[in-house]
Amino acid sequence: MLQRISSKLHRRFLSGLLRVKHYPLRRILLPLILLQIIIITFIWSNSPQRNGLGRDADYLLPNYNELDSDDDSWYSILTSSFKNDRKIQFAKTLYENLKFGTNPKWVNEYTLQNDLLSVKMGPRKGSKLESVDELKFYDFDPRLTWSVVLNHLQNNDADQPEKLPFSWYDWTTFHELNKLISIDKTVLPCNFLFQSAFDKESLEAIETELGEPLFLYERPKYAQKLWYKAARNQDRIKDSKELKKHCSKLFTPDGHGSPKGLRFNTQFQIKELYDKVRPEVYQLQARNYILTTQSHPLSISIIESDNSTYQVPLQTEKSKNLVQSGLLQEYINDNINSTNKRKKNKQDVEFNHNRLFQEFVNNDQVNSLYKLEIEETDKFTFDKDLVYLSPSDFKFDASKKIEELEEQKKLYPDKFSAHNENYLNSLKNSVKTSPALQRKFFYEAGAVKQYKGMGFHRDKRFFNVDTLINDKQEYQARLNSMIRTFQKFTKANGIISWLSHGTLYGYLYNGMAFPWDNDFDLQMPIKHLQLLSQYFNQSLILEDPRQGNGRYFLDVSDSLTVRINGNGKNNIDARFIDVDTGLYIDITGLASTSAPSRDYLNSYIEERLQEEHLDINNIPESNGETATLPDKVDDGLVNMATLNITELRDYITSDENKNHKRVPTDTDLKDLLKKELEELPKSKTIENKLNPKQRYFLNEKLKLYNCRNNHFNSFEELSPLINTVFHGVPALIPHRHTYCLHNEYHVPDRYAFDAYKNTAYLPEFRFWFDYDGLKKCSNINSWYPNIPSINSWNPNLLKEISSTKFESKLFDSNKVSEYSFKNLSMDDVRLIYKNIPKAGFIEVFTNLYNSFNVTAYRQKELEIQYCQNLTFIEKKKLLHQLRINVAPKLSSPAKDPFLFGYEKAMWKDLSKSMNQTTLDQVTKIVHEEYVGKIIDLSESLKYRNFSLFNITFDETGTTLDDNTEDYTPANTVEVNPVDFKSNLNFSSNSFLDLNSYGLDLFAPTLSDVNRKGIQMFDKDPIIVYEDYAYAKLLEERKRREKKKKEEEEKKKKEEEEKKKKEEEEKKKKEEEEKKKKEEEEKKKKEEEEKKKQEEEEKKKKEEEEKKKQEEGEKMKNEDEENKKNEDEEKKKNEEEEKKKQEEKNKKNEDEEKKKQEEEEKKKNEEEEKKKQEEGHSN
C-alpha cells in the first residue's frame, strides 16, 4: 500500500513540476520532492510489509534451505536480493510447491496446539482451547486421522481384528458444514437447506456470526436483486409434510434447541436428499446427509503403494469420531512427548502419520491381523508385459457361490466377515432380479440447478466442493488422484481391469485422459467384478499416505448377475467414488450374454461361424444364461429372473398369475417387447433373427462378451492385455485397443495435429490445448502486442494452403491456424512455452510441466511400437526395459488435490499479508525459472538426449530379465527368423539409451512432406507374434469387406440404374398415357364445350322466348292492373265524392239543426224574459 502511495505522490509532484515554468519555483519544489522521498522510504523500511509478511503469517514458516538460481536473465538481480530474505524465500518455495511440486510432502507439521486446539472459524475464531473435550468441531486433516487410527491399531494387543469406531466426520472434508456447526446463536429451520437458493436474511445472520462467507461459489450474486428473485422462485419443497420426509430438527442435550450445545453436528438431520436446488445449498445438504444418515462402510482398505492391502473392519451401528471414541485422547496420552515445542508451558503433540504408517506396514502382528490376501487372484500377473485372460474369467456361477458362502457361514460363523455377509445377501437378491424389472442403483446429482450440467458427473450422496468447477488445476488433480489410486488398488490385489471407451481413447495420444472428460471408464471380466464386490463392496479405500491423500468409497450394484441391458436402469456395475467431491470411476463387467451383438462384429462372426462349422440359420439354443439361477423364489413362485422377455410376458399375462401382487403389469414390458420383437429383426446385426437362447449359445461359443450397456468385445480383442502406463502408474489396456476404438469412435489414422471440441492436440507438446488460448499463445494473427508471434506462418504459402486437404473438420475455416500448428519449428515451441504464462494461462503451463515425463513416456512407447526398423523381438525387449526401468521413475502428473487445497489456502492467507507487488515478482521469477526448465526438457526430447530414457543396468553380473519368454509364438504359427534377430545385448552393456531407438514423433508433421503426420492409428501395434498373422487376416478381412462393399455398391448401382431405367420407361409410358388421355380429355372437353354451347344457346333462346312471353304477360298484366287501378281509383274517387257530399249534407243538416236550436233557444229566452217582465209588472 505504501509503495503504491509513494508512486502516486511521485507522479503528482513530477507532473506538477513539469507544468511549472517559473525557475525560482522549481528550485523550491525540488527539495520538497527529495524530502518526500526520504520520508516515504523511512516509513516503508520500518513497516511490516517491507518484509513481505505480517506478524500473523509467522506460524506458516517452515525451515527451508535457501534456493539458488544460476539464471542470468533479467530477474537474476532481483532473485539474489530475495535470497537473504527468509520470508520471501518461503513465499517462493510455497508457490513452487503449489504449482510445480507433485511430491506429496507437507510444508509444515500438524500439532495439537497450533492446529487442533486453535479455533480457525466461527464466533470463537482465534481462541485457544484447553483440551480436546472443548472441541465443538474440527476440520478433517489426513495427518490427524491417520496418526490416531494407526496408533490405535498398532497398540491393540487383540489376536483378532478389532472393529474400529467410525464416523464420516474423520474421513472426508466438512469445512463448509463446520461453519454451520460452529455458530452459537442463529437458529435455522429445516427448509434452509431445501430452498432453491438460501434465504438471504438467514444467510446474512450466519455470516455475521461467522465473520466470513458461508460459501464461495457465486456468493456475490446474492446481492443482485433480479438474480436473487429468480433463483428463489425456482422449484423447492413447500409442503411441511413433504419436508419432514427429508429433514428433522436436532436438539441439544439440554433440550432447549439452541445450536450452542451441539457438538460435531448441525441443527438438523437430512434423512433424504433433494437436489433441485443450487449447488451451494445442495453441498451443505449432502454433507449433512453423509454425516447424519449415510450408512458406514464395512471396512477401511489401506493400500501400501501398489503392493498390498490392509483391511480393517468398522463399527457400523453407531457413529463415533476420534473425540467421541476416545481414540484421540489415547493418541495424546501415548505421544505427549512427541515434540519439543512448548507454548504457554503446555506440551505439544505432533501427528506424524508417515512415520506411523511405516511402522504399521513393518509390524508383523499388524500383517497377521489386517493384511488381505485374495486366494482367487495372482498379484504377480502384473509383473509381466502381457496379462493373459481366460474364457472362464467371463463366466460366473451364482448358485454355486451362494452355496459356498452359506457353507462357510455355517462352518465358521465367527470368521464370516461383514463383507462376505453383505456379498451373500447381494447375490441372493440379484439372482431374483429380472433384467426387465431391475431398480436403479446409482444416483447422480443431475438436478442441481445452475451448475453447468456438472451434477450428472457427481454421486448424489458425496456431492461437495462448490469451488471445484472454477479451478481447472484442482479438478484435474482430483481426477488424476482418483485414477492413480484405483490402478494401484487393483494391482495391489491382483484384480484385473482395463481402460475402455473415452478413457482408452485419451490414453492413445499421450497416456492421459482427455481434458474434457469428467470421469473414467474401466472394464473387467465378470469373475473379477464378483471378487471386487465380495472383498471390497462398501469399503473405504485409502491411498498410501506417503503417496497421496485419496479416500474413495467403493459401491457395487446389488444386481451383478443381471448381465443384459434390460430396462436400462443399471448400465454401471460399480463406482469408485471420491468422498470429498462425488467424482467417480465407472466400472462395468463383461460376460457372455444373450444380448444381440453389434453390427461391426458381423464380419468376425461370419469368419468364426465358418471355423466352427455353424449355420446362422440353424443355431442351437442354450439355457446357460439362467442355468445357475434358482427356478423358484422364497414364495414358491417362478423366479422371473430366469425368464427372457417373451417368456416373462407370457408368464405375467396368464390367467393364473396376472392378479398376483408380485407380478408386474405387462405395460412395464412394452418398450422391451418392442425392441425384441419389432426393432431387433430390422437391425443390421447378423443375430437379428435369433432368439435369446440362440444368441447366448452363439456369443458364448464365439467368445463374445458385453457389458450391460451392450458394448461388445471378442476375446481376441482383449487378451492378452498390455501392461502400460496411464497417468504415471501401471495400467492394462486391451490387446487390440486401436481396433476397439475404431469400432466405437472416428479415430484418425495419423498421429498429428488434431482437434476436437474447440481443443487442439499438438504432438510437440503432447497436450490438448484450448484452441482460443493456443491462438493467443502463438499470436498468429498478431492481435496481442505484448506477445511475440510464432514464425511457422508464412504468407507466401497461401497457394499451398488453398490446395491442402485439411483433415480436421472443426478447423476448415481456420486453415491458417491449422497450417501453422502443423509446421512448428523448435523456435516456435520455445516461444509458445514462454508465451503461455505471459498470456495468463498458468494452469495450462502447470499441467504441461507436471505431466511432461508421463506424456514423454507414452511418446517413446509409440515410437518403439510402430518403428519399422526394429525387429519384433527388439521391440519387445525395448518396451520391456521401458516399462521396468523407466515407468517406476515417473512421478504424478498432478499434485495431490488435498495438498493442493491446503497450500492454496496458505497462499491465499499469505497474499492477504504480503505486498502484492512483491508477490507478483515472486510468481514471475518462478514462472521464468520453470519456462527455462521445460524448454530444456523439450529440447532434450527433441534432440534425443532425454535423461529419463537413459538406463543404467545392475553391474553385479546378474542376468538381466528381458521377458523374452513372454513372446514365444505358438507351435502352430509360422515364424520368420528375421523377426527374432536382435542386435541388442543388454548382458554385455551396463547402459542402454532408449533415445536411440524408434520413430521420431516429436514433430510428426515435419517428417511428412504432405504435413499429414505419421500413419499409425489405422492399425494396432504388433504385441504378440500371432499379430502378424492376425494383421494379414485383418487385411484380408478388410479386403473382403471392401470387395463386398464394392459388390454391394455395384449391385446397388445396377439396381439403381435398372430402377432408374424402369422408372424412365414407366415415366415415358405414363407420359404417353397422359398425353393420350389429355387428347381424349381435350376432345371430350371440346364436345362437351360444343354441347354446352348449344345447350346454352338453346337455353338462351328459350330464356329469351320466355322473357318475351313473360314481358307480354307482364304488359297485359300491367294493363289489366292499370285498368283495375283506374277503376279502383275512380270508384275510390266516387266514394270519396259521395262521402264528401254526405259529410257536406250532414254538415248542412247539423248547421240547420243548430240554427233551429239556437232560434228555439232564443225564442224561449225571449218568452221567459217576457214572462219575467209581466211578473214584475204585477
UniProtKB/Swiss-Prot annotation:
Superkingdom: Eukaryota
Effect of substituting residue 519 to A: Impaired the function
Induction (free text): Expression is increased at late logarithmic and stationary phases of cell growth. Expression is also induced by osmotic stress.
Motif DXD location, chain numbering: 519-521
The family this protein is said to belong to: Belongs to the MNN4 family.
Protein name per UniProt: Mannosyltransferase regulator 4
Disruption-associated phenotype: Decreases the mannosylphosphate content in cell wall mannans. Eliminates N-glycan mannosylphosphorylation, when its paralog MNN14 is also deleted.
Practical uses of the protein: Mannosylphosphorylated glycans are found only in fungi, including yeast, and the elimination of mannosylphosphates from glycans is a prerequisite for yeast glycoengineering to produce human-compatible glycoproteins.
GO terms, biological process: protein glycosylation; protein N-linked glycosylation; protein O-linked glycosylation
Organism this protein belongs to: Saccharomyces cerevisiae (strain ATCC 204508 / S288c)
